[in-house]
């Protein structure tokens, strides 16, 4: 009997593991492209999200362009408008005006004449914003509107220069710097500032509108890519109430002037060359940008772009926050 058979068998047995591993390697190498193909498939699955993100980016670019054009038109209209308000930085450069200066007297008379309608339109604008931002009716809110309705007095003040303010100890009075009175040359410009100050009166020492202020600050931060503190949110909300009140006033008092010119008067004092800020206020031009981003309808009234259907945004989330007690101090509309 040949002895080579067992040896042959052993040799075959030694080769089988190597052959098996070689086959596995071939199979893995053959399957590798199928794994590579998975990557495009995963990308294809994420393309709807990518398209949505691209759509949001495009919408943001369109809004930014609308706001930019609206700002340019507002400031161009101010330069051409005989009744255009002086920019804030120009007001600050002027010397103080005496109480009996003709322009001061004319401004005070304009403010007194517009105060009754300003109270109505400011209250309507506040109620609209409260609905949009999910601020519920409460005793504090009712007290806010009661305070607003009780304002009766316009008081010129040389020391306030280019500012307006309210004092907690005089809740029925709005004080105007004499330069400010002389520099707001149109009904629209004056009414916007009155509505701003009336919103401060409504808020009061107890901070009745703090939830609304916080909601506006958060939304403006998203709309205009800004970080807005609580106090700046308060001032921005007052400016927004002023702009909405002016829009309502224009709608109810048609005239021969263009819509763009009359709308620009609500913003014209922000058309500054020196765009400074402080702790309480956004800079004037940043304020204008935030307002137009918050209210694109206002921007379209300046540019003449077709109006889009207005939709109510989702209410801002409600959060509770303690408000620090404020001393009796002036409340100013802007810097």
Q: What are these language model-derived features?
A:
Residues 178-192:
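Short pre-active-site segment immediately N-terminal to the catalytic Zn-binding motif
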Residues 188, 198-214, 250:
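Catalytic Zn2+-binding segment of zinc metalloproteases
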